[in-house]
């Protein structure tokens, strides 16, 4: 099997405001479980942003409960997450996208760390 590099993704979803708080918490837990089990991802961070006003109405609502989840996966099973969002009526909007900027920062930090280690061990230096 070929090695597939893990990528960093951000998934934002909005839960309808008429859903009770306990049920909203359960929905967030279900999304996390889908990311871990079906998408085979590793969750990095979960941000519950709470109720926010919309710039325009969405499905006759003027506000919603926002949640953002950052996770790593190879991207092959992301459709499982999108399908869950699509068939869950309490989730009124969602968007999942790859975070190239975070991947770039991570690669840069790894290169800098490797360069610092090379200097410490005396590798890759110029000869006098």
UniProtKB/Swiss-Prot annotation:
* One of the protein's GO biological processes: translation
Note the SS bond partners: none
Under the heading Pfam families, the entry gives: Ribosomal_S6
User: One GO term of the cellular component aspect?
Assistant: ribosome
Name the UniProt key words of this record, in alphabetical order: Ribonucleoprotein, Ribosomal protein, RNA-binding, rRNA-binding
> What GO MF terms are annotated?
small ribosomal subunit rRNA binding; structural constituent of ribosome
User: By its UniProt entry, which InterPro entries does this protein fall under?
Assistant: Ribosomal_bS6 (IPR000529), Ribosomal_bS6_sf (IPR035980), Ribosomal_S6_plastid/chlpt (IPR020814), Transl_elong_EF1B/ribsomal_bS6 (IPR014717)
Q: Which CDD domains match?
A: bS6
Query: Could you confirm whether the keyword Ribonucleoprotein appears in this record?
Result: yes
Q: What is this protein's function per UniProt? A: Binds together with bS18 to 16S ribosomal RNA.
Q: Give the protein family.
A: Belongs to the bacterial ribosomal protein bS6 family.
Q: What is this protein called?
A: Small ribosomal subunit protein bS6
- Recorded source organism is Thermotoga petrophila (strain ATCC BAA-488 / DSM 13995 / JCM 10881 / RKU-1)
């Amino acid at each position: 099997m070929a090695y597939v590099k893990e990528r960093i993704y951000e998934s934002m979803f909005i839960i309808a405001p008429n859903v009770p708080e306990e049920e909203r918490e359960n929905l967030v837990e279900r999304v996390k479980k889908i990311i871990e089990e079906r998408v085979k991802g590793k969750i990095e961070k979960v941000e519950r942003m709470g109720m926010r006003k919309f710039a325009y109405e969405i499905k006759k609502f003027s506000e919603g409960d926002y949640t953002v989840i950052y996770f790593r996966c190879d991207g092959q099973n992301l459709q499982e997450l999108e399908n869950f969002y699509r068939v869950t009526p309490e989730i009124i909007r969602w968007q999942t996208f790859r975070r190239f900027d975070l991947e770039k920062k991570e690669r840069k930090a790894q290169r800098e760390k490797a360069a610092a280690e090379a200097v410490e061990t005396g590798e890759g230096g110029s000869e006098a």
